[in-house]
Each structure stands twice: as structure tokens, then as C-alpha cells.
């Protein structure tokens, strides 16, 4: 099957044996990166969480000009972006090893809660306190072949609801699903200098 690869070591290991999609962690924001990944065999290139609308248009235009065709792109339009990867487990440091398998934990500051994903090897991923939600933007995003919904801590019911909202958007719904209290559009509508 098709692999999702987030590092160059994985690309070089599997490029000749498995079809693959490059992941967001390669931080792709320009046409040269897309071209290189396609040359290395990527069937589709996932764009960086950091890309904005103008950068996406510039990337697509430059790629088309240089290659007489559009790139095969994927974009994450829903999900909690990872903010920090740690080599240790905060629960283990507090002598509560194993509790992460029983319930969900989070870091709290004065404004937000940051969910903690615990992994089998006692590493952790700290997730953004706000959810990237570009579902309202999907129909205006051109030349992106696949939109990804990246689920991490959502319940089964939430997953079903979000998939239905995305399908409604792709079918032309104009009802906004963006919640300013819980969601962010990330950098998408911002100018990055």
C-alpha cells in the first residue's frame, strides 16, 4: 500500500519499493521542494501547516511555469498541529507511568489547554490548543488534489461529525463551521514576510 513518509530517511528507504505521500513534517512551502519530492517518487506532496493562501498560489504558479503541469498536492484542512515532540513522558517523571493509557492528559496555561499524545516508547507529542479548521476555505483552494482531516484526540462521534461537515463543504454548503473559540485558520489567511 501507499506509505505516508515524513522524513528523508524514510523516502530513501522506501522510494524504490513502495508508493508514498510525503507528509507535512517536510515543511513544503515552495515549488522547488515539491518538484524535488516528485522526482524522488512522491505520489503526492503534503504542504506545510505554515503555508498561506498567497504562498500556495505562488507555489502552484511557479511549478506550472517550470513544469508545464500542476503538482499533486495534499493539504491538512482539519486537525491539531503538533507543537512539540519530547523524548520523555511527563507522567513518568511524576511516577504515574502507564496512566496515559487510561485517560487523556493536557498541559494548561492561563489561556489554553494543550493535549498530550503519549506514545508506546514513552515519548510524547504536545498538540496545539486550537484546532486548525480550514473546512470553510476548501472550495476556494485551487490545485490541491487531496484534503486531509487529521484526527488525534477526537471521539468517534466527533470524527463522524467532522467528516460530514467536510463532505457538506465539498458539496457546496455555505454554512460556516469555523468556531473562533476552539478553532484557528493558522497562517492560511495571513501574510508571512
Question: Positions of the model-derived regions?
Answer:
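Active-site pocket-lining/capping segments in soluble small-molecule metabolic enzymes
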Residues: 1-193
Amino acid at each position: 500500500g501507499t506509505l505516508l513518509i515524513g522524513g528523508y530517511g524514510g523516502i530513501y528507504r522506501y522510494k524504490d519499493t513502495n508508493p508514498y505521500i510525503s507528509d507535512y513534517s517536510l515543511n513544503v512551502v515552495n515549488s522547488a521542494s515539491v518538484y524535488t519530492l516528485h522526482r524522488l517518487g512522491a505520489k503526492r506532496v503534503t504542504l506545510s501547516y505554515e503555508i498561506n493562501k498567497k504562498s500556495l498560489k505562488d507555489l502552484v504558479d511557479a511549478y506550472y511555469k517550470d513544469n508545464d503541469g500542476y503538482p499533486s498536492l495534499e493539504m491538512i484542512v482539519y486537525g491539531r498541529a503538533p507543537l512539540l515532540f519530547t523524548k520523555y513522558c511527563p507522567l513518568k517523571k511524576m511516577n504515574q507511568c502507564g496512566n496515559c493509557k487510561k485517560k487523556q492528559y493536557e498541559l494548561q496555561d492561563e489561556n489554553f489547554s494543550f493535549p498530550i499524545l503519549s506514545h508506546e516508547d514513552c515519548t510524547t507529542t504536545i498538540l496545539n490548543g486550537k484546532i486548525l479548521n480550514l473546512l470553510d476555505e476548501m472550495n476556494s483552494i485551487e490545485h490541491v488534489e487531496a484534503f486531509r482531516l487529521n484526527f488525534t484526540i477526537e471521539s468517534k462521534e466527533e470524527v463522524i461529525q467532522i467528516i460530514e461537515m467536510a463532505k457538506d463543504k465539498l458539496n457546496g454548503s455555505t454554512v460556516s463551521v469555523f468556531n473562533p473559540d476552539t478553532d484557528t485558520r493558522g497562517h492560511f489567511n495571513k501574510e508571512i514576510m
